[in-house]
């Protein structure tokens, strides 16, 4: 089993548990260059809010898109967009990534901005 398959296996297990809870989930994905966050409806078929370092405004604001500062900016932005849509409680889906570095920074900034998980 390679690194990606292991991560997907971990993500599947967590997503199955979140689906049982019928919770809106905050999904985080990271690549070597960018960080992405989406708030997905409990049925899994609708993206309620999204933010990523690919967006021009974020890239201009943070400069380097692959560090913790960029993840903090994404966390604040996704929380603001979710709260605008009336979502305050979410389940955090780390997509099999270790809760460390950019993933943890995004989660902490989203909590500080008003999301509860």
UniProtKB/Swiss-Prot annotation:
An annotated GO cellular component: cytosolic large ribosomal subunit
Check the record and name the InterPro entries matching this protein: Ribosomal_uL18_bac-type, Ribosomal_uL18_bac/euk
A molecular function (GO) term: structural constituent of ribosome
**Any Gene Ontology biological process:** translation
Keyword Ribonucleoprotein assigned to the entry: answer is: yes
Q: Does the keyword Ribosomal protein apply?
A: yes
What are the record keywords, sorted?
Answer: Ribonucleoprotein, Ribosomal protein, RNA-binding, rRNA-binding
Short name of one Pfam family for this protein?
Ribosomal_L18p
Under the heading PANTHER family, the entry gives: 39S RIBOSOMAL PROTEIN L18, MITOCHONDRIAL, LARGE RIBOSOMAL SUBUNIT PROTEIN UL18M
Q: Assembly and partners? A: Part of the 50S ribosomal subunit; part of the 5S rRNA/L5/L18/L25 subcomplex. Contacts the 5S and 23S rRNAs.
Q: What family does this belong to?
A: Belongs to the universal ribosomal protein uL18 family.
HAMAP family for this protein: Ribosomal_uL18_B
Instruction: Provide the function of this protein.
Output: This is one of the proteins that bind and probably mediate the attachment of the 5S RNA into the large ribosomal subunit, where it forms part of the central protuberance.
Kindly provide the name given to this protein in its UniProt entry: Large ribosomal subunit protein uL18
Tell me the organism.
Answer: Aliivibrio salmonicida (strain LFI1238) (Vibrio salmonicida (strain LFI1238))
